[in-house]
């Protein structure tokens, strides 16, 4: 099977990490990138050097207005309007929408004007169908032109919640994600009219924040709709986050039994999405981990057989970006079978 030709709109954190992952992905070839705010030489620099993930494993060069990565030309566009990007010139049939701006179906559909067939939004969407690998990707039937890969936190939480709900039944639960700071936060205190706490210096503070990640699980696992909610605590680390899921379960089980159930799922149907560790790990040990969710056996606790706290790590950049591409490859496979 020939590689799936992909375009990336938005060359920020996720756009660049998706590109890096694509180089390692056997089914994907990035043939075009669009970003109106940077020129090609700067795009090459940002792809080559990364403070969290290190030096790019390969060759990055510039040829006129285009990138050349590992000897292959990657067309570089600088269009502000997605409808003006000529994806068809490069053969890009699938577009990763990673600007964080065009997150509705109507806005993301603009990519179809330039020749794209499908758009995968690398963020939650208010109206596009959301899919999480290992959870509900089998629901994709090829009919939607625009889909969402949900958020990095939902990708961590949903596989874990699925295993617990399938085996024990979740009555209700609360989630907290202890989340690294992101590009939307401030390096020092600055104006943030909609979120006053969010305007405080990211590297100086622990900042309580909101997240829709837990409620979004109800969209990908309808049986959990209304049973989960959560919050975020932004902390002074640049990458890697951790989910704390506290649930009341219907079918009583010891923490050890629950652990064995999670391990069985991680070694079986959810391999590559859900993983586990019994080591005394810290956040930096998870840097570059390609799994969506890494269950920390030693970090969790239970109060009794029906009330348990589970802890799971995720590289909110690398693991999530790999899932974007895995979902894209799955979508392309389903589309090809139609």
Swiss-Prot record:
D-glyceraldehyde 3-phosphate binds at residues 151-153, 182, 211-212, 234. The active site is at residue 152. It comes from Trichoderma koningii. The lineage of its organism: Eukaryota, Fungi, Dikarya, Ascomycota, Pezizomycotina. SMART domains: Gp_dh_N (SM00846). The keyword Methyltransferase does not apply. Its main location: cytoplasm. This is Glyceraldehyde-3-phosphate dehydrogenase 2. This protein is a koningic acid (antibiotic)-sensitive GAPDH isozyme. It is present only when no antibiotic is produced.
């Amino acid at each position: 099977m020939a590689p799936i030709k992909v375009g990336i709109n938005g060359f920020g954190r996720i756009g660049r990490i998706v590109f890096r992952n694509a180089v390692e992905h056997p089914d994907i070839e990035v043939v075009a990138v669009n970003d109106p705010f940077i020129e090609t030489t700067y795009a090459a620099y940002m792809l080559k050097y990364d403070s969290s993930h290190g030096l790019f494993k390969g060759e990055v060069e510039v040829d006129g207005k285009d990138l050349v990565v590992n000897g292959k030309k990657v067309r570089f566009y600088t269009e502000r309007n997605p409808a003006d990007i000529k994806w068809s010139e490069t053969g890009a049939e699938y577009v990763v929408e990673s600007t964080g701006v065009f997150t509705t179906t109507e806005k993301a559909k603009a990519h179809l004007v330039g020749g794209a067939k499908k758009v995968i939004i690398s963020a939650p969407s208010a109206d596009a169908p959301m899919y999480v690998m290992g959870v509900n990707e089998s629901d994709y039937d090829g009919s939607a032109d625009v889909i969402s890969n949900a958020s990095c936190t939902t990708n961590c939480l949903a596989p874990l919640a699925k295993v617990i709900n399938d085996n024990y039944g979740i009555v209700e639960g609360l989630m907290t994600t202890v989340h690294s700071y992101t590009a939307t936060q401030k390096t020092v205190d600055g104006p943030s009219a909609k979120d006053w706490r969010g305007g405080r210096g990211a590297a100086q503070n622990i900042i309580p924040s909101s997240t829709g990640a837990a409620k979004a699980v109800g969209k990908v696992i309808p049986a959990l709709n209304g049973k989960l909610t959560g919050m975020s605590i932004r902390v002074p680390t640049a990458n890697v986050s951790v989910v704390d899921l506290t649930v009341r379960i219907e079918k009583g089980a010891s923490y050890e039994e629950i652990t064995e159930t999670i391990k069985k799922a991680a070694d079986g149907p959810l391999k590559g999405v859900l993983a586990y560790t019994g080591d005394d790990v810290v956040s930096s040990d998870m840097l570059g981990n390609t799994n969506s969710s890494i269950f920390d056996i030693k970090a969790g606790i239970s109060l009794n057989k029906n009330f348990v706290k589970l802890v799971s790590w995720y590289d909110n950049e690398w693991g999530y970006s790999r899932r974007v591409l895995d979902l894209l490859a799955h979508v392309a496979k389903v589309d090809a079978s139609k």
